[in-house]
Structure formats: structure tokens, C-alpha cells
């Protein structure tokens, strides 16, 4: 029986969101593998809700304000030290759809690559959006952080979360994917949309403008902040 650690950074999101994420993890286990949910609190579990869930939780006491990168790093180290066979990541407002993990597991039974899925898009209220997937994901040039199944063979490559500069944390998934590519790791794609992704990004609402939330994120503004950081001469030594 293989052990899979599913790592979630938690920043006191609505209880119903983390509850759905947690329930989706527990429903994945079968006679080949067991999924265990590790929730790392970015600060403190203010309302003490995690004790209501079937999970292992850990509080960092301080909020690191880096888009969950520090909690992912701590969770990754914990999973490695506890000798898990696979690691996955799941944001607190997302959830695994039926058969998500099994579909990925079947791709890499030889553990010779990292398995990846596509996303299905939902509003923050959980309404299905008419949006297929970002074009770079469909072209296999990007993978969302919540879409990986990573075997133990590749654990030595993956814990870079704490090294990502805080001003670029909104791009952490792209930096992570780029790093894996530099390591020449083989990706295997299920091409199934089995990760349910609640989105605040404007581009995902182009066919459902009536569902667009007030606190929408504009990709161009996020990109501008990241570009400003990367092209600032004072920051170049970070990447040397």
C-alpha cells in the first residue's frame, strides 16, 4: 500500500472550502494507495476548525505572506521525513474530483515521471465556469501546483518553495514548473480535467461575466509586479 501526502497551505479560509478540500482527499484512497492530508497553517488556526477534519495539521504561528510557499516547504519536508511514497499539493479552496489521484497514479506506476492533470474551473461560490483551460497548460508548457502527483524518486528536486522570492510568490507555480523542467524531469499528462479550481482570475470569467467576483485579479497587474522584480538590477544576485 503506497502512502500519498497531500499538502495544503491554510490561511484561515472559509471552513466550508477547506472542509470540501479535505473530504475530496479522503475519498481518493483505494486498495493501491492511501491519501493523507497534511494542512500547514500560515499563522494560527484562529477559529480552531482544523480539529474537525481528518487531517494532520501544523501551525507556523507566523503568517509568512508568500502565497503559501513557506507552508508548502514545511509540509514537503515533513512528508519526506515521514517516508511518504508520493507528494501532492492542494490549495485550500480547490478540491480533487472523483478518481483524480487514481488517474494520475495509473500513469506512473513505474514511478519514472511526474503525473499531471488539467483543471476544471469554478467560481468562488462553486459554480462551473465555461472555460476549458489556460492555453499554456493545454500545450503542456505549464502545470498548476494542485495538479501534480510526484513520486519519491523526485523528492530531492521539489522543495524549492522557500527559495522563491516573496515579491514573485504569485508566480510560484510557474517558477516551480520551470525548475522541474530544468531538472529534465519527464511529465506524464492524464489530459483529464480532474482538479476543481476555484478562480479569482479575470481571464477565466470571459464566458461567465455575470459570475465575476468583485475582488477579481487581473493577470496583467500580477505580471507587471513580477517583471518589475526580475528586471531590477538589485535583485539579480538572487538568481545567480
Regions found by a protein language model. Give the residues of each.
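N-proximal low-complexity "stem/linker" segments adjacent to membrane-targeting elements
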Residues: 1-24
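Short, acidic, metal-binding catalytic loop of nucleotide-sugar glycosyltransferases
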Residues: 20-34
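Short beta-strand/loop segment that forms part of the nucleotide-sugar
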Residues: 33-44, 59-61
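Active-site-proximal specificity loops/subdomain of glycosyltransferases
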Residues: 46-82
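Short beta-strand-to-loop acidic/aromatic patch adjacent to the donor-nucleotide binding site
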Residues: 84-95
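Conserved donor NDP-sugar-binding/catalytic core segment of glycosyltransferases
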Residues: 102-129
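A recurrent flexible, glycine/aromatic-enriched loop bordering the glycosyltransferase active site
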Residues: 129-149
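C-terminal catalytic/acceptor-binding lobe
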Residues: 163-240
Amino acid at each position: 500500500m503506497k502512502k500519498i501526502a497531500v499538502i495544503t497551505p491554510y490561511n484561515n479560509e472559509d471552513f466550508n472550502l477547506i472542509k470540501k478540500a479535505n473530504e475530496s482527499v479522503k475519498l481518493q484512497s483505494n486498495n493501491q494507495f492511501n491519501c493523507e492530508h497534511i494542512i500547514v497553517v500560515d499563522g494560527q488556526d484562529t477559529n480552531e476548525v482544523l480539529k474537525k477534519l481528518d487531517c494532520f495539521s501544523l501551525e507556523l504561528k507566523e503568517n509568512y505572506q508568500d502565497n503559501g510557499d513557506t507552508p508548502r516547504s514545511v509540509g514537503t519536508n515533513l512528508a519526506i521525513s515521514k517516508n511518504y511514497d508520493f507528494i501532492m499539493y492542494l490549495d485550500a479552496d480547490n478540491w480533487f474530483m472523483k478518481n483524480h489521484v487514481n488517474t494520475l497514479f495509473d500513469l506512473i506506476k513505474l514511478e519514472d515521471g511526474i503525473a499531471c492533470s488539467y483543471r476544471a474551473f469554478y467560481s468562488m461560490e462553486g459554480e462551473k465556469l465555461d472555460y476549458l483551460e489556460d492555453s499554456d497548460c493545454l500545450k503542456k508548457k505549464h502545470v498548476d501546483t494542485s495538479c501534480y502527483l510526484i513520486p519519491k524518486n523526485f523528492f530531492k528536486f521539489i522543495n524549492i518553495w522557500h527559495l522563491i522570492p516573496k515579491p514573485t510568490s504569485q508566480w510560484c507555480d510557474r517558477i516551480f514548473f520551470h525548475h522541474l523542467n530544468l531538472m529534465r524531469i519527464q511529465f506524464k499528462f492524464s489530459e483529464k480535467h480532474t482538479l476543481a479550481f476555484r478562480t479569482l482570475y479575470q481571464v477565466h470569467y470571459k464566458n461567465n461575466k455575470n459570475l465575476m467576483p468583485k475582488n477579481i485579479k487581473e493577470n496583467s497587474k500580477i505580471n507587471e509586479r513580477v517583471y518589475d522584480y526580475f528586471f531590477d538590477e538589485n535583485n539579480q544576485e538572487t538568481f545567480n
